[in-house]
């Protein structure tokens, strides 16, 4: 079985920063919780005085939250953010949670690929989960497509339409 054969639905949401990719996935998650066994994680911005200083990871099942990246100097890093490799275990645990028939992956991007097991965990989710909703950093669309994702480009103008389309594709209604 190839990666493309298993998942019934692999939707990736990509777009420029600030268009609402994580917001869309979070809103879909709220509706989907009553219908699906969900696994995965959400990445949220951390702000101080209105300025983004980093990102936290939240396990969508347990609600456990850990710091993932902060401004600073150190390794590994992506741009101005230093990655907390200790949080990679939370990402792995969140993706491997069973049972799972809808995986939330927010996001597939450079920071997540700094985690030693992220590629393996992502491949396992793609192979073993019938539905996946992911946010895709715009520089990683090619990788997502190779994994069989259908990628939707999100803008502020098409946000509401895309949200409704994703719900419909998952068999959900609001």
Curated annotation (Swiss-Prot):
Enzyme kind, highest EC tier: hydrolase
Known EC number: 3.6.1.15
Record-stated family: Belongs to the THEP1 NTPase family.
Reaction catalysed by this enzyme: a ribonucleoside 5'-triphosphate + H2O = a ribonucleoside 5'-diphosphate + phosphate + H(+)
Annotated PANTHER family: CANCER-RELATED NUCLEOSIDE-TRIPHOSPHATASE (PTHR43146:SF1)
GO molecular function list: ATP binding; ribonucleoside triphosphate phosphatase activity
Protein name per its UniProtKB record: Nucleoside-triphosphatase THEP1
UniProt key word Mitochondrion: no
Physiological role: Has nucleotide phosphatase activity towards ATP, GTP, CTP, TTP and UTP. May hydrolyze nucleoside diphosphates with lower efficiency.
Organism in which the protein naturally occurs: Pyrobaculum islandicum (strain DSM 4184 / JCM 9189 / GEO3)
Keywords: ATP-binding, Hydrolase, Nucleotide-binding
Domain of life assignment: Archaea
Keyword Nucleotide-binding: yes
Binding site for ATP: 15-22, 102-109
């Amino acid at each position: 079985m190839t990666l493309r054969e298993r998942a019934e639905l692999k939707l990736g949401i990509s777009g420029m920063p600030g268009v609402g990719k994580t917001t869309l996935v979070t809103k879909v998650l709220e509706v989907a919780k009553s219908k699906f066994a969900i696994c995965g994680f959400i990445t949220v911005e951390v702000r101080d005085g209105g300025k983004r200083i980093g990102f936290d990871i939240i396990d969508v099942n347990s609600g456990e939250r850990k710091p993932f990246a902060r401004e600073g100097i150190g390794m590994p890093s992506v741009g101005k953010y230093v990655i907390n490799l200790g949080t990679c275990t939370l990402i792995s645990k969140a993706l491997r949670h069973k049972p799972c028939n809808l995986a939330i992956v927010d996001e597939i991007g450079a920071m997540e690929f700094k985690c030693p097991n992220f590629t393996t965990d992502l491949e396992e989710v793609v192979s073993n989960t019938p539905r996946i909703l992911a946010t895709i950093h715009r520089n990683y669309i090619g990788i997502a497509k190779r994994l069989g994702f259908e990628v939707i480009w999100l803008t502020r103008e098409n946000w509401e339409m895309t949200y409704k389309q994703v719900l419909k594709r998952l068999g959900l209604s609001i």
